[in-house]
Amino acid sequence: MSALFRPAGRLTARLLAAALVAAALPPTAAQADDLVTPRELTVAAGLPAAQASAQVLAARRYGTFWDTGDTALARAALAPDFTDRTLPAGRAQGLPGPLAASRTMRAAVPDLRCEIEQMIVAGDRVVVHLHFRGHFTGTFNGTAGHGQPVDFITTDIYRIADGRIADNWHIEANLTLMRQLGLAN
């Protein structure tokens, strides 16, 4: 096991995770209820609590943007100079890229939901394993859906600066998604 992560008892780890999630919540309970909470949270030993909380909050805001399509959350999560380090062909760089991707996905899968299965926080990085689900009832690149289920994963690595996502490296299970949409064999 890396020296960065010291083993802790299950109860200690759960209490630490709960405290970090609670510390990362927005000021009011109503706002807190609206943010996606990671199913599993791992924070590197020795990371200052304030830094960890800010990083968790940025990642939760961005995860909730993908869950809801609320562009205000993307604007709050992403730095003004946000850079997509694995920019797909044809996607705009910076904030316009994820906003357009979300619109495209929601046009195809209006009931799209996103859960944060795992979140790992270390240094200035946050790794998230996201799980998307919904039904293809809209259209995607001219193809109409027939209600078929959509269920795919992504993994993102965020670099956080000043409490916002400055860089993102990501990989999606695109072949799985395209097969579910009926666009690939």
Language model segments and positions:
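Exposed beta-sheet edge and beta->alpha loop/turn motif
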Residues: 131-162
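Short beta-strand edge/turn micro-motifs at domain boundaries
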Residues: 34, 127, 151-179
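Short, low-complexity N-terminal intrinsically disordered segments enriched in polar/charged residues
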Residues: 31-76, 80-81, 184
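A mature extracytoplasmic/lumenal domain signature
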Residues: 118-120, 132-134, 172
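C-terminal segment of classical bacterial N-terminal signal peptides
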Residues: 21-29
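A solvent-exposed, acidic/Ser-Thr-rich amphipathic alpha-helical stretch
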Residues: 57, 71-123
